[in-house]
Amino acid sequence: MEYEIVIGLEVHAELATKTKMYCGCTAEFGGQPNTHVCPVCMGLPGALPHINKRAVDYGIKAGLALNCSITHIGRMDRKHIFYPDNSRNYQITQDELPLCTNGYIEIELEDGSKKKIGVERIHIEEDAGKLLHTNAGTLVDFNRCGVPLAEIVSKPDMRSPREAVTYLEELKSILSCVGVSDCKMEEGSLRCDANISVMKKGAKEFGVRTEIKNMNSFKAVEKALNYEYERHIKAIESGEKLTQETRRWDDAKNETAPMRSKEEANDYRYFPEGDLVTLNIDDEWIESIRKTIPELPYQKRERFIKEFGIPKYDASVLTLTMSMADFFEKTAKISGDAKSASNWLMGDISKIMKENYVWIEDLKFTPEQLSELIKLINEGTVSNAIGKKVIIKMFETGKSPKNIIEEEGLIQNSNEDEILNIVKEVLSENEKSIEDYKNGKNRVVGFLIGLVMKKTKGKANPKIVNKLMIDELNKQ
């Protein structure tokens, strides 16, 4: 029996406003617990909310970037939820009149074909606080309570976990590009819940739906969806009755666990928020925001491929965040070597950022300095191997590559006589490798070149080493 997976995603993106959704408290991440609070976001009796216009602007901007229709009449509603991280026992959100509807994101599938994933709606709302569970009990931090969110609800159009991750990557890239959210998953500013069901291939009715929460990375989303797909199939084939429920992904155990039965809309007892006015959004407002939308990621990808001649894969990776795309574009233009700029950013620099938990905007060096390093390598002043050491020093100190090379004595040695002596020395110490070469084992050339580079501490010009090594081997 063949089965088909049906996936829909609910993405919560914290909007990049300076203040909270319904009060003037800072929306900045972090801070000492319960210091970014006031009577409004704490839900104290008599405290009245007022809506953050910038949050509405950002919601509209997200909708336009995702090809949505923007409502002209929007309304805020109360959604009743009884959790300790929401002190007023209701969330101010949108129910019947969301800000944006009927959009789509176009993604590229693994076979190169394009597919449109529908965006059912985008509504704006407030975030909840955080619960910290300890051995002594549960602590509540209300700093995040009231931070503006855009909830982006997809249609159930995805048919594989890989499609879901591709959709998320493109969504993150778009939101980052238009500047409505920084999309930092490790800070909780981009969170995703998944709804999954499994049905027999060709069936017209979806199966029993499961919601999955607590997925803190795109990798976790893919793993959780694959796990649930297998769990549903096993249940169907064994005759087990599935129930609509919410489950939590456990990253340590690589499995989901039950949280609670899945609520329906009527469980939340929605009704209009009487303390806030209706949103009246005219065409002039919408068009003024449309004019601020920059070049979108798919447009930037196409331009990078055409203008800089880089592969499609490179363009896709470099445009995942706009800060990375901007850094690349500046470096490519200044250095005149787009492929080297791409290789450095996707390779060593991304590795350094990952190991040190920093973003590209946190780097101490600039596109101008990276361009200088690329030029020094291309001119033969230093080898690519030395360049890898220089980039680490640039990250640590912010110094220019030229200064680092001079201070560390890293200038490349291109003196053929000196290099030839070292080549002969290496060959005299590795007679077996010479015999292997004579017997057609050409791989030993790389091994021998590596020994020369080791003796010169990476300073020998690799092109000269390669030429001299082959010449000497052929003389043996």
Swiss-Prot record:
Enzyme nomenclature, EC number: 6.3.5.-
Keyword Ligase set for record: yes
Keywords, in A-Z order: ATP-binding, Ligase, Nucleotide-binding, Protein biosynthesis
Stored SUPFAM superfamilies: GatB/YqeY motif (SSF89095), Glutamine synthetase/guanido kinase (SSF55931)
An example Gene Ontology molecular-function term: glutaminyl-tRNA synthase (glutamine-hydrolyzing) activity
Reaction(s) catalysed (UniProt annotation): L-glutamyl-tRNA(Gln) + L-glutamine + ATP + H2O = L-glutaminyl-tRNA(Gln) + L-glutamate + ADP + phosphate + H(+); L-aspartyl-tRNA(Asn) + L-glutamine + ATP + H2O = L-asparaginyl-tRNA(Asn) + L-glutamate + ADP + phosphate + 2 H(+)
Described purpose of this protein according to its UniProt entry: Allows the formation of correctly charged Asn-tRNA(Asn) or Gln-tRNA(Gln) through the transamidation of misacylated Asp-tRNA(Asn) or Glu-tRNA(Gln) in organisms which lack either or both of asparaginyl-tRNA or glutaminyl-tRNA synthetases. The reaction takes place in the presence of glutamine and ATP through an activated phospho-Asp-tRNA(Asn) or phospho-Glu-tRNA(Gln).
Protein name: Aspartyl/glutamyl-tRNA(Asn/Gln) amidotransferase subunit B 1
